[in-house]
Regions:
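Sec-dependent bacterial lipoprotein signal peptides
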Residues: 1-26
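An acidic-aromatic pocket/loop used at catalytic or ligand-binding sites
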Residues: 2-5, 27-137
């Protein structure tokens, strides 16, 4: 009986492996971009907006970059939850208001704020801001 159970578990595993491989290879692919000296993962389908000018948020003045692409906000959220954790970043807060979501991460004394909001044309604007946290006094 035990042999039959082990055999069926192995069969199930072998059936799921191609599906898992497909999900891994077709998921939201990434590339790394350097912002304020940090390698930050960016979804592959996002292109940089070099002329985008915005006021930095206090605490995130070290550097910023803006991107735009046809990536759903939920995909961006899931992407950053996965890749930032894999790089050792800890989520510290999440904000949602008026069609704009933000997630803040910390690693050591460095801070990263990821903001994203959908456009009416089906694209999403992604803004990444980097800062340095002052040591406690």
């Amino acid at each position: 009986m035990l042999g039959k159970f082990e055999h069926s578990s192995l069969q199930r595993l072998l059936l799921w492996m191609p599906l898992i491989a497909l999900l891994i290879t077709t998921g939201c692919q990434k590339r790394n971009e350097v912002i304020a000296g940090l390698e930050i993962p960016i979804p592959e389908k996002m292109t940089r907006n070099p002329d985008k000018v915005f006021d930095p948020i206090p605490g995130f003045q070290d550097g910023q970059a803006s991107y735009q692409g046809k990536v759903a906000p939920k995909e961006i959220f899931d992407f950053y939850q996965e890749v930032m954790a894999a790089k050792g970043w800890q989520p510290t807060s999440r904000f949602a208001r008026n069609e704009q979501d933000s997630i803040a991460y910390t690693k050591g004394n460095r801070l990263v704020l990821v903001k994203y909001n959908p456009n009416p044309d089906g694209t999403t604007v992604l803004t990444v801001m980097v800062g340095t946290q002052d040591p406690p006094k």
